């Protein structure tokens, strides 16, 4: 419940940033400014994640690292949106609806069977997905799925309010330094 209340407060406080990002996306590539995608939630349930669109409308609906030339699909504003993780701000809607939390494993794409199989083996599938997580601040896009699951399992074992605060602080540091951002 605390996650939902805090997300609602952040949604109100950050609404000017929402409007500015939406306006830039609209000016460059029109509507829709949001991107929704099928993701895997707690206990292997599916939900629609909301993000700001950083890619052009005609981009194939696959993980960015699977695209032959991801930069050709990136909006001009898209690089900045991703570098500052502004594309994740609409995840607040997912937190308010109860599908996500602030700290947990990043939600896998519906077709990332290899990642989900490892998460099930590690018991990490029992966690609600988060906007940020232990794996996010320990490598993000630069680590293998095995390493991600190792960090997620470690998070499961150490999960606490103070550990979540440590991860949130680490997230701000990572975002400011653009640590772990590939695309």
Segments predicted by a language model, with ranges:
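Short, glycine-rich, amphipathic interfacial segments at transmembrane boundaries or analogous
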Residues: 35-73, 131-151
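Residue-level "hotspot" positions that anchor or transmit function at local structural transition points
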Residues: 11, 65-68, 125
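Short, conserved beta-strand/loop elements in beta-sheet-dominated catalytic cores
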Residues: 79-101
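Short, well-ordered beta-strand elements within core beta-sheets of diverse protein domains
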Residues: 77-84, 153-157
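Short, cationic motifs built from Arg/Lys/His that form the positively charged side of catalytic pockets
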Residues: 39, 51-55, 73, 81-82, ...
